[in-house]
Amino acid sequence: MLSSSDSKVEPALKKQKYQDKAIDLDKSEEFDKFFLDFNQNQIYQNNSRDLGEQYEPPSNAEPNDLNEEINKALSTFNEFNQTNSIKLSFKNEANSSATESSSPMDSPGTLTSSVTSNDEEVYADDSKQNPSHRISNVQSNSDDQASMTNMVNQSTLTSIKQSMINTSKLISTFTTLKTTYLKLCKEFNYLLNKFKDNEKIKIELINENNELKHLLMEIIKQRELEKSTTRHTTPISNSRKRKCPSS
């Protein structure tokens, strides 16, 4: 039975193989192009050198003979180039048939379309190492990720604990303020009731004072009436007393 790390490494190895094949094909195509260009340059240099040596006209030749020699040299040069171009085209056809006969999975187009740039970097790094190193790297990466998650979890837990402590402190201060506010409200209500009672007493006293004033005024009026009546009755009594001795 294969472990999870081995099952993760196998598709990476397959993709790396396809990538290596694509790189080899690209390198072989570049080498063939370079080889063709190099051969063409060499053929051109050799032909020009051979024609210069074989068909160099004599100094005493006439102009008509010189033209004929030039035409012969050009014809032989063209024939030589045609034969070499046929050979080169045959070689190119053979290379193209070899690339076409390969499987579609080996073509660079499918490989480049199936593999992303990030995977290419990972595969290039993995190609320098053997499978045991890859497995160890995968395990180390998983361990690093686990340690990072643990660190993140610890940091989040500490932050949550600190926030809970702060909220508990705020709640305690809020409760103390609430209790003091309620006490102040009770005292204010008590004082307000006392003030209302005092106002009622004050109003009652004012009413009593008014009643007393009214009674006092009535008493004063009665006294005055009595005085006035006594004044009217006293002269009559005196006149009677004077008349009595004469009789």
Swiss-Prot record:
One of its GO terms (cellular component) is cytoplasm. Signal peptide: none annotated. Residues 129-146 have a biased composition (Polar residues). Keywords: Cytoplasm, Nucleus. Its main location: cytoplasm. The keyword Cytoplasm applies. Residues 95-146, 226-247 are annotated as: Disordered. It is found in: Cytoplasm; Nucleus. Involved in cation homeostasis and in the regulation of the cation stress signaling cascades. This is Protein ATC1/LIC4. The lineage of its organism: Eukaryota, Fungi, Dikarya, Ascomycota, Saccharomycotina. The gene is ATC1.
